[in-house]
Regions:
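Conserved beta-strand-loop-alpha-helix hinge in the C-terminal portion
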Residues: 221-248
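ABC family nucleotide-binding domain
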Residues: 2-217, 222
Length: 248
């Protein structure tokens, strides 16, 4: 199986001298094709930094990032931008929906930018929204949607097309427990059915139990990893010393 995301001894520091902060320290991981990986850890542990570096949105101070086996270390900014647009979908806590576009237009825009016809892009967007229970909200603008609905639009946008990787930072943060489970189920199914690779940051052990593998991070260091075969309770025990903020 192909390593779709690979970090090799990645470190990230901010500032200099006494003010230097080490957000990541020699983090190494790999996520293979079709795998769903959850990342858990306390606030400020480096989870979001790990995700943005894995998605080539941020440069590591040292170390190397590979996407689908290809190092991005010496790529030009233009080539990285092209890689992101064609290969990686992002879902962050701030939804970044364009206020002047409808839900369907927000979802179809990345496809159109990549050369898909407007008509075909709309068909794909409507199908994606319908799959997330938003078929009747496709013509609504972001300010006409609830926070949970906007989050689902962002998830649909990240997954449309032939994206091989989806990176999600607390993708269910604005959703209730039922819709949160539905989102994780959808991501898990997409990984198994299409070979997509997903990396999801979450504080919720119940949601992390949908992943094939869970990585624990603390103080910028990957401290452990496990398969959640025994369910969320085993993750809570595993993470007790790593993340006191886990839902109990």
């Amino acid at each position: 199986m192909t390593n779709m995301i690979e970090l090799r001894q990645v470190s990230k520091s901010y500032g200099q001298g006494d003010a230097e902060v080490h957000a990541l320290h020699k983090a190494s991981l790999a996520a293979i094709e079709g795998e769903m990986v959850a990342v858990m850890g306390p606030s400020g542990s480096g989870k979001s930094t790990l995700l943005t570096i894995a998605g080539t949105l941020e440069e590591p101070t040292t170390g190397e990032v590979l996407i689908a086996g290809q190092s991005v270390k010496d790529m030009s900014k233009a080539k990285k931008a092209q890689l992101r647009r064609r290969t990686i979908g992002y879902v962050f806590q701030d939804f970044n929906l364009l206020p002047g576009l409808t839900a369907a237009e927000n979802v179809s825009l990345p496809l159109e930018l990549d050369g898909t016809s407007a008509r075909r892009a709309r068909v794909v967007a409507l199908k994606a929204l319908d799959g997330l229970g938003l078929g009747n909200r496709a013509g609504h603008y972001p300010d006409q949607l609830s926070g949970g609905e906007r989050q689902r639009v962002a998830i649909a946008r990240a997954m449309v097309g032939e994206r091989k990787i989806v990176l999600a930072d607390e993708p269910s943060g604005a959703l209730d427990s039922v819709n949160s489970e539905a989102i994780m189920r959808l991501l898990h199914s997409a990984c198994k059915d299409t070979g997509m690779t997903a990396m999801v940051v979450t504080h919720d052990a119940q949601l992390a139990s949908w992943a094939d593998r869970v990585i624990f991070i603390r103080d910028g260091r990957i401290t452990d990893q496990t398969t959640p075969l025994a369910g969320p309770e085993s993750l809570l025990v595993k993470a007790a010393s790593t993340n006191p903020e886990l839902d109990r």
